[in-house]
Amino acid sequence: MTEEIVVIPGDGIGAEVIPAAVDVLKAVGDFEFVEADAGDHVKEETGEALPQETYDLAAEADATLFGAAGETAADVILPLRTAVDSFVNVRPAKAYPGVDALRPETDLVFLRENTEGVYSGHEDRLSEDLSTLTRVVTTSASERLAEYACDYVGGEGGSFQVAHKANVMRETDGRFRDAAVAVADERGVETEEVLMDAFATRVCLDPTQFDTIVCPNLAGDVLSDLAAGLVGGLGLLPSANIGPDAALFEPVHGSAPDIAGEGIANPAATILSAAMLLDYLDHEAEADRVRSAVEGVLADGPRTPDLGGDASTEDVTAAILDRL
């Protein structure tokens, strides 16, 4: 049976990088693509950034590939993650030969809790002077992330780091840390605890101290973006939002309105997200081919302006397709 992939270009450069990734997927497999819409322009036209039809398509598809959203990002990506019941956001941050990186030895994977924390939407404006935010952390969600992390590092004998701020947020981050460490201990997986602010310093000084980092929602968002600065920028970071029966894949970068429409957006992060999608659908050989092609182009060129080159999105995509 042909697998169904929903593609949502979204706003800004999403409309430029998603077609590039679709061309790559077509080059390595036989998929049925269903295009859906979401984002700022959809809200202007219909009054809602994420139509129910798009939400339903993502919930029912074998996998979904999303580009970017602008001002309506929170109204689009958070519900889409809910649609696939995504409990973990997987964010690799890797430096590639040929790319000018602050820390070329960087090779990290962030496993970020994806349903709770300060992104769970419980904000209130109580007066002209006071707004509040409720942070939600449950043992069950923390354990589910930890179980995934144990599987990710190969189970017994593996290891990962737990980044938290339990010395200050004792109840919430304390609960997260305790749950993650307890699951790892039960599975025979070694853990190292690191305070998230200390991690930010240490990873800049020597990223080889770390490999797989398990974090609460906000910390994972911030720390993985920091890691992007070590490897050459957000244009290189893919991500996967994994649920029990569905998944959503997206580049970490945003809609980049400053360059949207110029045809110079770096498609690497989106194409690498497509490689993660292939892994998820058990097409590991094809995923490896895609990653190899991207790495070859990053090493030898052509490169988009964000990486010091003058190539267009189409030029880079064509070079990747040639290698496939």
Swiss-Prot record:
Its cofactor is Mg(2+); Mn(2+). One of its GO terms (molecular function) is 3-isopropylmalate dehydrogenase activity. One of its GO terms (biological process) is tricarboxylic acid cycle. Homotetramer. Catalyzes the oxidation of 3-carboxy-2-hydroxy-4-methylpentanoate (3-isopropylmalate) to 3-carboxy-4-methyl-2-oxopentanoate. The product decarboxylates to 4-methyl-2 oxopentanoate. Mg(2+) binds at D197, D221, D225. It is found in: Cytoplasm. Belongs to the isocitrate and isopropylmalate dehydrogenases family. Pfam families: Iso_dh. Pathway: Amino-acid biosynthesis; L-leucine biosynthesis; L-leucine from 3-methyl-2-oxobutanoate: step 3/4. It is an enzyme of class 1 (oxidoreductase). Substrate binds at R81, R91, R112, D197. NAD(+) binds at G254, S255, A256, P257, D258, I259, A260, G261, E262, G263, I264, A265, N266. This is 3-isopropylmalate dehydrogenase.
